Amino acid sequence: MSETLAERAAAFIVNAKNRNHSPAVVELAKRCLVDWMGVAIGASGEPVSRTVALSALAWGAQGEARILLGDRTTPALAALANATMGHALDFDDTRGHAPSHLSSPTWSAALAVAQHRDMDGVTALSAFITGYEISAVIGDVLAGGEDIGTYGFGNLMQGAGFHPTSVLGRLSATAAAAVLMGCSQEQAVNALATAATMGGGLTASFGTMAKPLHSGKAAMDGVQAAELAARGFIAAPEVFEAPGGFASAFVQTATTKFDDVTFSPGESLSDNSFKPYACGKLIHGHIDAARDLRDEWAERPVKQIRCRVAEISTRLVGRPLPTTHLEG
């Protein structure tokens, strides 16, 4: 029987400690850290950030992982609060193919576990690179069918109503945590399979506090999945490919094949990008166009501006009269 996707990803996880990443990859990972931490600190005073942080601290759980600008708690709860902050302004970095924001849940999980275990930044950096690569590659896997054509798995997932940051972010957070916890290959398989069955996050929640919570829960569940597996928890190793599993549940109108998936350290980071505007990237081009026209039309009356957009844009960011920045 051929290896499952979870088994191949687990092998990539356990070999993380033996890798020497290129300076270019390390620099990209550092930029992701700076971007995530910057937007998270910028969002620390937002109502959603305060609510989630206070809720996490109300558990009274003891640990050495710090909520940004706040107190210490367990790794899972710190990851929950910090990844929620990181996505609260919709300003965190994003992938070009699978529409996901992986740095927030992945760095939140990696930093929380590393702090709790008193591990150095280089080790946390390697864990982040490993986790990011796994989720990015899975999100980019081509899926399709006769009626719909071929698209990336992450794009089809979003079209079906699932938030890729939530679903894929759980896997990257799990992988990063598993690296730092020193999970065996069998434990890493079970950690990823556990994270896969926890997946969720609905795009109908966009425009509310629930959207940044998707990122927070992805980070929290990733840490918890790795912790459970490290203590002997067993899940389904074939969960990604099996009927009723990850692929068939999140993209029901297409066939997804993970047979040829391979992971290359840091390769997917080159497709990461940093947002110029704090809103969904689907409308960044329209903002650019408006800015280009601003000077030319500054002194002329404008009654109406019409923009052509994809159908999914109207569903995800189509709020003509937003009342909060969460609706961007």
Regions found by a protein language model. Name each.
Residues 1-270, 313:
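N-terminal core-entry segment
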Residues 280-328:
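Intrinsically disordered, low-complexity Ser/Thr/Pro/Gly-rich interaction regions
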Residues 103-105, 167, 279-282, 328:
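Conserved phosphate/anionic-ligand binding catalytic regions in large, soluble enzymes, centered on
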Residues 269-282:
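Glycine-rich phosphate/diphosphate-binding loops and the adjacent beta-loop-alpha structural elements
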